[in-house]
């Protein structure tokens, strides 16, 4: 398996996206911005397991790998650093209702996809990666 830094999840429920607002701490990347579930790799886990473990830690949701319908590895934004992954999947209303938000972040919500893509306080490279996925859907 190729080394990677971490993985994020774009989880859709109808036309909305599961997002959370990052803590406002100067020592973390993208403080206060709207972000997607996910985070850094631990040990030798696969990209899928990394994303799903982070989802469980951050939102209390347990999904199986077969719920991920799309994935792509993206080069790092910083030269010399490892790449990261974006996966896409769907959530049901029942799963949304069962969310138990963890202790990282200021809060979560289901944000309309179009709003996330245009939001001035969303993590910019995740907006671009979500656009990449959506363009694949239109072309596919």
Regions found by a protein language model. Name each.
Residues 5, 32, 83-85, 104:
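Residues that flank catalytic or metal-binding motifs in active/ligand-binding sites
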Residues 1-35:
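N-terminal strand-loop-strand
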Residues 3, 13-15, 72-98, 109, ...:
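Active-site-adjacent beta-strand/loop module that shapes the phosphate/pyrophosphate-binding cleft
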Residues 36-69:
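The catalytic Nudix box helix
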Residues 41, 116-117:
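A generic structural signal for short hydrophobic patches within well-formed alpha-helices
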Residues 96-102, 119-123:
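Short, charged, solvent-exposed linker or helix-capping segments at domain edges/interfaces
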Residues 33, 43, 103-105, 113, ...:
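Functional cleft and adjacent loop/helix regions within the main domain
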């Amino acid at each position: 398996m190729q080394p990677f830094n971490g993985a994020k999840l774009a989880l859709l429920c109808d036309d909305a996206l599961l997002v959370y607002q990052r803590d406002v701490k100067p020592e973390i990347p993208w403080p206060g911005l709207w972000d997607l579930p996910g985070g850094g790799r631990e040990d030798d886990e696969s990209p899928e397991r990394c994303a799903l473990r982070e989802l469980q830690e951050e939102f209390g949701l347990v999904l199986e790998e077969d719920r991920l319908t799309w994935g792509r590895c993206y080069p790092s934004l910083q030269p010399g650093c490892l790449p990261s992954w974006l996966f896409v999947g769907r959530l049901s209303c029942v799963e949304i209702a069962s969310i138990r938000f963890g202790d990282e972040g200021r809060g979560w919500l289901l944000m309309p996809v179009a709003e996330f893509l245009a939001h001035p306080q969303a993590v910019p490279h995740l907006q671009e990666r979500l656009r990449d996925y959506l363009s694949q859907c239109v072309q596919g």
